[in-house]
A protein has these predicted regions:
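Acidic, gly/ser/pro-rich intrinsically disordered tails
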Residues: 1-3, 21-24, 44-45, 92, ...
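Core FKBP-type peptidyl-prolyl cis-trans isomerase
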Residues: 7-49, 85, 95
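OB-fold and OB-like beta-barrel modules that bind single-stranded nucleic acids
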Residues: 10-13, 33, 71-82, 101-104
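A generic structural motif
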Residues: 17, 37, 61, 105-108
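Well-ordered beta-strand positions enriched in small/hydrophobic/aromatic, beta-favoring residues
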Residues: 31-33, 55, 99
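A short, charge-rich alpha-helical start-of-domain segment used by transcription regulators
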Residues: 51-53
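Beta-rich strand-turn-strand
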Residues: 55-94
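OB-fold/S1-family single-stranded nucleic acid-binding modules
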Residues: 88-106
């Protein structure tokens, strides 16, 4: 039987994406993504619990992230878990589990505020139903 390695997240970037170009000019981008779950404890108090995920994007998705995403951007990510092992300079074994994204959807609503902050508007981010001819009530 085949296994399934599928991750789906909606969350906010913890910092601007980093991008670097590997041999062959292949772009790779990384950023932390925060997801927050809220629940009530036994006393009815709302508790928020945030998990941090390391996201890795390759090629076109990496360039898209570099161009349009910034700290606090809300995104939908689909991908798979990937664990890397290596030794640092002191020969200490390190482990990192990351989410290699196959799909990225930008969920932030387009606003002029982004343009003022130096961020370009997202292509295709217009809502085709916004300000449409609504039937009068």
């Amino acid at each position: 039987m085949r296994g399934v390695n599928k991750v789906t997240l909606i969350g906010n970037l913890g910092k601007d994406p980093d991008i670097l170009y590997l041999e062959g000019n292949i772009p790779v981008s990384k950023f932390p993504l925060a997801t927050t779950e809220t629940y009530k404890d036994k006393n009815g108090k709302l508790i928020s619990q945030t998990e941090w995920h390391n996201i890795v994007l390759w090629r076109g998705l990496a360039e898209l992230a570099q161009k349009y995403l910034h700290k606090s951007s809300l995104v939908y990510i689909e991908g798979r878990l990937k664990t890397r092992y290596w030794e640092d300079r002191d020969h200490i074994r390190k482990v990192a589990t990351e989410i290699v994204a196959d799909n990225l959807i930008m969920l932030d609503k387009r606003s002029d505020q982004h343009a003022e902050e130096g961020h370009e508007p997202l292509p295709g981010s217009e809502n085709p139903f916004e300000d449409s001819d609504k039937p009068s009530e």
